Amino acid sequence: MVSETKTTEAPGLRRELKARHLTMIAIGGSIGTGLFVASGATISQAGPGGALLSYMLIGLMVYFLMTSLGELAAYMPVSGSFATYGQNYVEEGFGFALGWNYWYNWAVTIAVDLVAAQLVMSWWFPDTPGWIWSALFLGVIFLLNYISVRGFGEAEYWFSLIKVTTVIVFIIVGVLMIIGIFKGAQPAGWSNWTIGEAPFAGGFAAMIGVAMIVGFSFQGTELIGIAAGESEDPAKNIPRAVRQVFWRILLFYVFAILIISLIIPYTDPSLLRNDVKDISVSPFTLVFQHAGLLSAAAVMNAVILTAVLSAGNSGMYASTRMLYTLACDGKAPRIFAKLSRGGVPRNALYATTVIAGLCFLTSMFGNQTVYLWLLNTSGMTGFIAWLGIAISHYRFRRGYVLQGHDINDLPYRSGFFPLGPIFAFILCLIITLGQNYEAFLKDTIDWGGVAATYIGIPLFLIIWFGYKLIKGTHFVRYSEMKFPQNDKK
């Protein structure tokens, strides 16, 4: 039998996120250290053409995923997002595993952001103990989420605005350098696409390897689905925000990568260094310095600190809301379903803060091996969440139509069904399974490295099938699916 799914809009959450908040979450959600720091490594490994093609391909995949999520979130705007859709339209245990894995992923990611924050601050204050900065930033992130959802929304709006402004200025400076208007700048142009093995250095294998990095860079775009549960007029604002995704991908990622590749040759050894500790070799910093802007390192340090805080702020919000929704559905202790007068799930916030703090402490005072395994177990979760979105949307639309509902009644309709979710699922699956494909091409396989890379997959399957075995659930048939908005009519 199919257990009764109790997932509805969680009572008590305040719909205080306005259209401008959602738009900035959609635009700035995935602009972070992946673009500001790690993008140089993609050009170095795959060449300018290979990196650009990888960003365009993964960007197309993410666009399809966001249109799928947009259709689901506009129709059923709940904070459980894809975990809710997974249990309603795929299988209850599937949604259970998606929810717990996503909460755990962000709790660990907050700890990673705390480590990154202290590394960034050490650039300015090398003699100050790093844990002081991490504790300070954890306190700031906690307070932004403690007061109200509007506090999170406002902080994320301004964080994202800083990141977006930086990318726009970067693109303008880059274009001026390329066309020769920026006086005193080092020469730039298409010559960097013809040196050595460019434009496709390393061939197809290098592009596959780069796709992994690019995929991680885009993670965070799905946050808009969770924010839908506290959005004003989600049927109107969610589609508007989702439509921004295509232009964000085109402008902020593709144009930025193109400009970097035209100004800095892929053979520049600085591009391979992608440690947030050394801002001076960020590809953005290198381009600004090529333009004669010698203070670029200090500016980019501040921007990257903003990106780290933004990631931590978003992670705290996402994990808190996911834990709250799990509790409302009876899939986590009920204590986490309690709300403050302002509509904030503070018990869930306390728990997430404690877990994130403990994970951080393992990196500081505990066994580094423990910390690395915690990090590795969460590494796959973003890709698993994307797979869950594609599967849930495909089955949602199929069930919706088979039950006789008119797709024109949907608040937002993905225009590429079924090709969009199918393409996104296949490509995301290839990226997920190909994370460490090089290990299997060597004479001796490093099984420890393989286990560290893929541990997130069996962990997800154990949670899923463990729940399925205990509860006796099965895949939801199309005829059994519930469509609450239509049922209300």
Curated annotation (Swiss-Prot):
Induction: Expression is repressed by high external lysine concentrations. The HTH-type transcriptional regulator ArgP is the main regulator of lysP transcription. Under lysine-limiting growth conditions, ArgP functions as a transcriptional activator by binding directly to the lysP promoter region. In the presence of lysine, Lys-loaded ArgP may prevent expression of the gene. In addition, expression is activated by the global regulator Lrp under lysine-limiting conditions. Expression is not affected by pH. The lineage of its organism: Bacteria, Pseudomonadati, Pseudomonadota, Gammaproteobacteria, Enterobacterales. Residues 2-22, 67-105, 150-161, 219-244, 312-346, 392-413, 468-489 are cytoplasmic. Residues 44-45, 127-128, 183-197, 266-290, 368-370, 435-446 are periplasmic. One of its GO terms (cellular component) is plasma membrane. It comes from the Bacteria. It is found in: Cell inner membrane. Pfam families: AA_permease. The chain crosses the membrane at residues 23-43, 46-66, 106-126, 129-149, 162-182, 198-218, 245-265, 291-311, 347-367, 371-391, 414-434, 447-467. This is Lysine-specific permease LysP. One of its GO terms (biological process) is L-lysine import across plasma membrane. The gene is lysP. The record marks D275, D278 as: Essential for the stimulus-dependent interaction with CadC. Permease involved in lysine uptake. In addition, functions as a lysine sensor that mediates the lysine-dependent regulation of the transcriptional activator CadC. In the absence of lysine, or at low lysine concentrations, LysP inhibits CadC by an interaction with the transmembrane domain of CadC. In the presence of lysine, LysP loses its ability to interact with and inhibit CadC, and acts as a lysine permease. Changing D275A: Retains 88% of wild-type lysine uptake activity, but can hardly inhibit CadC. Cannot interact with CadC.
